[in-house]
Amino acid sequence: MYQFRKDVQFMCGFAGYYGAGDFNREEVIDQMGERIAHRGPDSKGSFVDDYVALGFRRLSIIDLEGGSQPIHSADGKHVIIFNGEIYNYQEIRKELIEKHGCQFQTNSDTEVILQGYKTYGEKIASMLRGMFAFVIYDKETHNLFGARDYFGIKPFYYAQMNGSLLFGSEIKSFLAHPHFHKEVNKDALKMYLIFQYTPLLETMFKGVFKLEPGTYFTYDGKELKKTKYFDPTYAKKDRSFDETVKLI
């Protein structure tokens, strides 16, 4: 979500990495967060263990007091960083409480995604309505799960380099990681010079990719698996005008 303050445009953002290295993990994630400080003027937060480091820069949209990130699950087994806004989070929250007995620590849409994942698993991505990019870390299995919204409104970049998986809202956060190697992607550069845009899933940096819209991923420390949870169909439907409006 965008918000104007004193003629400056801000939006939330996150950065993170998975993998070991001969460096100070807390210092690296803090520096990665500083690279995207312009995205979140309200607060910052981080989570670091021996496998993963997550950093967040926050612009308050919903739940000013209770939405600081990263957010941990009540049982302490999962942690999430999230950029975006979920329009139907109240409906999902109600279902989680009434049908599954879930308890919430905050009123934020972020925690709804986290509890939804713990309850429904990977299916939660297709249940969300809104614009979003997020990563959830399982502290017990040391696996990652993340997703990007249906139409790619919220950015999500990733790179696998020297045994590390880097991910975030902006590529510039990767520049603060010791394993990141800067190299121009000549194929993407050609596309940009032709179209003034890079239509590929690649970016101007070699080895850095966009997570496709309508896609979620899992990562176990070795293999990154991507799954398409949404693919628009254009088959003609025999619906009335009122039915179509309701679906929209």
Per-region residue spans from a language model:
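Cysteine-centered catalytic environments shared across enzyme families
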Residues: 8-248
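Low-complexity, intrinsically disordered or signal/transmembrane-proximal segments
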Residues: 2-3, 9
